[in-house]
Amino acid sequence: MTYFEAFFLALLQGFTEFLPISSSAHLILPSAILGWPDQGLAFDVAVHVGTLAAVVIYFRKEVVTLLTAWVGSIVKKEHNKESNLAWLIVLATIPAALFGLLFKDFIEIYLRSAWVIAATTIVFGLLLWWVDKNATLAKDEYQMTWKKALFLGIAQAMAMIPGTSRSGITITAALYLGFTREAAARFSFLMSIPIITLAGSYLGLKLAMSDISIHLGLLSTGVIVSFISAYICIHFFLKLISSMGMMPFVIYRILLGSSLLVWLALH
């Protein structure tokens, strides 16, 4: 991997991780079209660290508040809306964690293909359009219930299917449940913290147990570039989502998926 490839892939990961457009659909393009080599396990860990740092630092006030309330609910048995939301985020993490443990190998073998990614990019883009068009957009994240959190957790588990988009499917599910676009995005991003932490830890453990050589310069590039691009992406997405809605992302997903299908048909 060259420094240009590391920069480009980290930039792509950072910008697409939190937008409802599927990071896997974008990360397959350099290898499928340009013939770039697989980015490797070590680089996967690096970009996970970068995107995790971005969402934690961006939501640092909320993270500290929720974490403090969560610990307080355990140690002091003090319960409030913040501790309740924290527990619901934990609940929403469980389906994806279990799904990942049970079906990761199956997904890697049978579903990680350009054809699947192209199809899911289009299908879930259309679902996002339909839900956003018909959503009531009335609730904030503190009106979350355990049933709604579990529903969002199941949606997050579905994001294991390449091309679905973790943020895309969870925002779609939250809009379907009547949450505002801002609340749907915030809860989706907060949900991402434990699941990215788990995924990054799993990859880090695999890396530690392997004999893969590590290039610190390339990994540092991955961490820094993915952090900066993800932070910028989160900031502007939350600023613009209420006014522009989901249609730009729907159109983009359909164009991307269709282009990928055409390219696959011709090759």
Swiss-Prot record:
EC number: 3.6.1.27
Segments crossing the lipid bilayer: 1-21, 39-59, 83-103, 111-131, 149-169, 189-209, 218-238, 246-266
InterPro entries tied to this protein: UppP
Keyword list, A-Z: Antibiotic resistance, Cell inner membrane, Cell membrane, Cell shape, Cell wall biogenesis/degradation, Hydrolase, Membrane, Peptidoglycan synthesis, Transmembrane, Transmembrane helix
GO cellular component, one term: plasma membrane
Main location per the UniProt record: membrane
Pfam families listed in its UniProt record: BacA
The organism's place on the tree of life at top rank: Bacteria
Compartment(s) where it occurs, according to its Swiss-Prot or TrEMBL record: Cell inner membrane
Enzyme class: hydrolase
Catalytic activity: di-trans,octa-cis-undecaprenyl diphosphate + H2O = di-trans,octa-cis-undecaprenyl phosphate + phosphate + H(+)
Membrane topology per record: Multi-pass membrane protein
A biological process from GO: regulation of cell shape
UniProt GO MF annotations: undecaprenyl-diphosphatase activity
Physiological role: Catalyzes the dephosphorylation of undecaprenyl diphosphate (UPP). Confers resistance to bacitracin.
Miscellaneous field: Bacitracin is thought to be involved in the inhibition of peptidoglycan synthesis by sequestering undecaprenyl diphosphate, thereby reducing the pool of lipid carrier available.
Family, similarity comment: Belongs to the UppP family.
Listed HAMAP family: Undec_diphosphatase
Protein name: Undecaprenyl-diphosphatase
Species of provenance: Aliivibrio fischeri (strain MJ11)
Gene that this polypeptide is encoded by: uppP
